[in-house]
A protein has these predicted regions:
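A structural signal for leucine-rich repeat
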Residues: 118-123, 151-157, 177-184, 200-217, ...
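The Skp1-binding helix-loop-helix core of N-terminal F-box domains in SCF E3 ubiquitin ligase adaptors
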Residues: 69-81, 98-99
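C-terminal interaction modules of eukaryotic adaptor/scaffold proteins
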Residues: 373-438
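Short, solvent-exposed loop/turn at the beta-strand->alpha-helix junction
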Residues: 110-117, 144-149, 170-175, 196-204, ...
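CRL adaptor-proximal regions
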Residues: 1-68, 437-438
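Short helix-loop-helix/strand-helix junction enriched in hydrophobic and basic residues
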Residues: 81-98
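Conserved hydrophobic beta-strand positions in leucine-rich repeat
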Residues: 104-106, 133-141, 162-167, 190-193, ...
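F-box-proximal linker/hinge
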Residues: 47, 55, 59, 106-157
């Protein structure tokens, strides 16, 4: 009984991070941890601090000066810190210094991540009861067993959290996300991509009541990735925009229910957006581009790939008002022609990356406008552009010397044209489907 009571107060086993058949638990290594496999699940025990013993004579602890010079980015990851804590009592105390735990990173589909987070945060809260004041980043992407319980643990224990990534954790819901953004006021980076139950980002009702009518500005999120949150609708986007007014990076890839109306809400509240993706949002049209154009010179990155309702009209809105655009992905927007490329090239002369693949109405004429205006172009994708020939490529290569990537797969271009590009753009990597060109 006494042994069991000691275990509940101590070090998380590395088995919380890795199942028994992982490399760290093969060939007898890691045998000091208590773990067992039951019906394919890892059952991790929590151990007491190891007894004090002499460290290995070849192991030297860093001096105070060396510690001050250490690069925080080189700290061991979560699983290695847990293993270090098993070496001896001194290493145990060093490994659990809260200053080493600015980041928790857990990976794996089978890991019991809810339990792992509970044990880790409980240990890190011992010096500052109930809160982990040093923890700023939690990354549990791909941990499919994460549930609302795990997010509640983070919300309750990590008030200084700045970055949370739960990509692919499809069991979490709006309520748990609301708790995190309400109890972690410094949260700036949130990745809930692939979390299909998440349809909104908002403060909890209790938190909203305590704040002023402008409580939406209390959410400090700047980076929000909701890729593949395919249940998100315009009303949800309206709520997100009203609460997250400081957004600078927003990714809505494959949020297929979003329409131009949702983008109108977004532009009312979020006027600082620099990067925006609405790729594969098939209901977004030229009217949506008119709304996005209200970002004007602040917009640097835009992805509208496979938005089939966007034509030259929408491109003209962007080109006219967003003159500092650096990246545009318009792949699969089959309504774009040489006229749209002309508007873009003449107004967005600082363009560095352009993808107009699968735009069959873009020809060598459009490439000529690019070549004569966008000298800083570094990446150009023309994949499956049926109207492109070697002549257009040669014009681009003769003017855009800094070109680093060119995709002409499934284009009817000659070997001579590809060799011309290679001669003029020395650093260019050419992706092609011409077997005669090496």
């Amino acid at each position: 009984d006494s042994d069991l009571s000691m275990r509940t107060l101590s070090t998380p086993s590395p088995a919380l991070i890795f199942p028994p058949n992982s490399p760290g638990f093969q060939n007898g290594r890691g045998s000091s941890t208590s773990s067992s496999s039951v019906t394919g699940e890892t059952v991790a025990m929590v151990h007491s601090p190891p007894p004090t013993r002499l460290t290995h004579p070849l192991i030297r602890l860093a001096s105070k000066h060396q510690k001050e010079q250490a690069n925080i980015d080189r700290l061991p990851p979560t699983n290695q810190l847990c293993r270090c804590a098993r070496v001896c009592r001194r290493w145990y105390n060093l490994a659990w210094d809260p200053r080493l735990w600015r980041t928790i990173r857990l990976t794996g589909e089978t890991i019991n991540v809810d339990r792992a987070l509970k044990v880790l945060t409980r240990r890190l809260c011992q010096d500052t009861p109930n809160v982990c004041l040093m923890l700023e980043t939690v990354i549990v992407s791909g941990c499919r067993r994460l549930t609302d319980r795990g997010l509640y643990t983070i919300a309750q224990c990590c008030p200084e959290l700045r970055r949370l990534e739960v990509s692919g954790c499809y069991n979490i819901s709006n309520e748990a996300v609301f708790d995190v953004v309400s109890l972690c006021p410094n949260l700036e980076h949130l990745d809930v991509s692939g979390c299909s139950k998440v349809t909104c980002i908002s403060l909890t009702r209790e938190a909203s009541i305590k704040l002023s009518p402008l409580h939406g500005k209390q959410i400090s999120i700047r980076y929000l990735d909701m890729t593949d949150c395919f249940v998100l609708e315009d009303e949800g986007l309206h709520t997100i925009a009203a609460h997250c007014t400081q957004l600078t990076h927003l990714y809505l890839r494959r949020c297929v229910r979003i329409t131009d109306e949702g983008l109108r809400y977004l532009m009312i509240y979020c006027t600082s957006i620099k990067e925006l993706s609405v790729s594969d949002c098939r209901f977004v049209s030229d009217f949506g581009m008119r709304e996005i154009a209200k970002l004007e010179s602040r917009l640097r990155y835009l992805s509208i790939a496979h938005c089939g309702r966007i034509t030259d009209v929408g491109i003209r809105y962007i080109a006219k008002y967003c003159s500092k655009l650096r990246y545009l992905n318009a792949r699969g927007c089959e309504g774009i022609t040489d006229h749209g490329v002309e508007y873009l090239a003449k107004n967005c002369t600082k363009l560095k990356s352009l993808d107009i693949g699968k735009c069959p109405l873009v020809s060598d004429t459009g490439l000529e406008f690019l070549a004569l205006n966008c000298f800083n172009l570094k990446r150009l994708s023309l994949k499956s552009c049926e109207s492109i020939t070697g002549q257009g490529l040669q014009i681009v290569a003769a003017n855009c010397f800094d070109l680093q990537m060119l995709n002409v797969q499934d284009c009817d271009v000659s070997v001579d044209a590809l060799r011309f590009v290679k001669r003029h753009c020395k650093r260019c990597i050419i992706e092609h489907t011409n077997p005669a060109f090496f």
